[in-house]
């Protein structure tokens, strides 16, 4: 019995170590492309009324933050940085929100920034992580440890068809609503253009 228990304990430890190593290896591969641009589709599912809200546009993931350039159904630009959230309307007017003291904004932006910079340790510090992979496809479900964040955001699921790509993100809110992003036509520029960098600068 003791021998059986020891074997089970050993295999559990090996499995846990393999999970950590695999997730770290994904972050390491993602860090090879610190900038990712492309097209996105977003589906927000409102659980209470069983309704889907669809939108689409272009996006930027970079160490500066995340930018959503929504083109349908209504044009708007939302840039989420580490210190501010900038919403730009079609007429050029901006609404700037200080995000330096907002844990939710910092968490969302910081999560992707940590993944694309290879900083898995930071993610393990802030989230409980369930990682699985099959061949080159992978999926990571991040559950926030911070109660303030968990009160709003239940989990962030990130997945890819290869170790160096993010193809889908599903954010589940505490009330059960979900926001699903699918990414296509992805490109990995070494540097952002001046126009792309300008999204993260308040005028």
Residue ranges and their predicted role:
Residues 58-107, 179:
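An acidic-aromatic
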Residues 95-139:
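Flexible, surface-exposed loop/linker segments and immediately adjacent secondary-structure boundaries
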Residues 54-56, 73, 81, 150-155, ...:
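Short, surface-exposed coil-to-beta transition loops
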Residues 4-14:
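Sec-dependent N-terminal signal peptides
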Residues 17-39, 44-50, 196-203:
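N-terminal leader/targeting segments and the immediate start of mature chains
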Residues 34-42, 55-59, 68:
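One face of beta-strands
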Residues 120-203:
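Gly/Pro-enriched, hydrophobic low-complexity segments
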């Amino acid at each position: 019995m003791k021998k059986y228990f020891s074997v089970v304990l050993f295999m559990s430890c090996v499995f846990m170590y393999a999970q950590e190593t695999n997730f770290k290896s994904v972050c390491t591969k993602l860090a090879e492309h610190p900038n990712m641009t492309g097209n996105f589709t977003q589906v927000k599912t409102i659980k209470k009324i069983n309704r889907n809200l669809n939108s689409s546009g272009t996006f930027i993931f970079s160490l500066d933050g995340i930018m959503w350039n929504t083109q349908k159904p209504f044009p708007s630009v939302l840039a989420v940085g580490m210190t501010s959230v900038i919403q730009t309307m079609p007429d050029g007017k901006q609404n700037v929100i200080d995000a330096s003291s907002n844990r939710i904004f910092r968490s969302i932006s910081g999560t992707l920034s940590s993944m694309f910079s290879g900083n898995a340790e930071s993610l393990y510090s802030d989230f409980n992580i369930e990682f699985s992979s099959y061949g080159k496809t992978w999926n990571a479900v991040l559950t926030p440890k911070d109660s303030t964040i968990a009160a709003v955001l239940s989990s962030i699921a990130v997945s890819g068809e290869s170790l160096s790509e993010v193809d889908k993100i599903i954010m589940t809110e505490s009330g059960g609503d979900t926001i699903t992003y699918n990414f296509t036509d992805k490109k990995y520029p070494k540097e952002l253009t001046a126009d792309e960098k300008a999204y993260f600068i308040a005028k």
